[in-house]
Amino acid sequence: VANGGHCILIPRFTPQSYAELIKKHKPNLIAGVPSLFEALLRVKEIEGADLSCLLGVFSGGDSLSVELKKRFDAFLKEHGASITVREGYGTTECVTASCLTPIHKQKEGSIGIPFPDTYYKIVKPGTQEEVPYGEEGEICLTGPTMMLEYVNHPEETAQTKQTHADGLTWVHTGDLGMMDEEGFIYFRQRIKRMIVTNGYNVYPSQLENILEGHEYVHLSC
């Protein structure tokens, strides 16, 4: 909007009306949660749409399964788009997105790399101890969009915003993830949703990926 673009607001969302608006306005950018993309794959109103207008499609707000991404990428190609879904990540505590899959390189299961002015690290849950590349832990981030505080909630603020040994103040997101050696971030799950069984950490998103990879399973949750 600040650069002269138009933002199309939808008073009440339905997959059918959303599909019709895409065909009518031919937007360049679409951002949504995974359930939006799943819904668009199912509605007949999107059939025959020319999506060559799209320059970017962004997914966030929840885990995008590998299977759904493959299906929607194929859908985009079939409808004339030359792009694929790019995953991103953000939290309320940093205002908006702070991590995005670059257009020139994508890695399966990754939510991308931090914005240029934002830094990420992965720490052992419940500590400030940074873990090695490839090891899972809590996602922490810092940057210019970091919140000041939870208003009138100093204890919650102190738990979320912590000053580490490097002198920087970091937001502890409560999300599990990892970072590879190229700086790509992988979101796993909210820490509270992790299942521990027989000493192993099991994440619902991993189970969903396995289930949705079966030819007879359309959607799992």
What kind of feature is each model-predicted range?
Residues G5-H25, P34-L36, V202-L207:
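ATP-dependent adenylate-forming carboxylate-activation enzymes
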Residues A2-G5, P27-G32, L41-S110, P116-Y119:
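Gly/Ser/Thr-rich phosphate-binding loop
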Residues I30, G143, L148-E149, L168, ...:
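AMP-binding/adenylate-forming catalytic core of the ANL superfamily
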Residues Y120-I122, K161, D175-M179:
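A structural signal for short hydrophobic beta-strand segments in well-ordered beta-sheet cores
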Residues S59-D62, Y89, T142-P144, N198-Y200:
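Glycine-rich beta-strand-to-loop/alpha-helix junction loops that act as flexible
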Residues V43, P154, H214-E215:
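Acidic-histidine catalytic/liganding microenvironments
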Residues I113-D117, E129-Q162, Y200-V202:
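Conserved ATP/PPi-binding loop(s) of AMP-dependent carboxylate-activating enzymes
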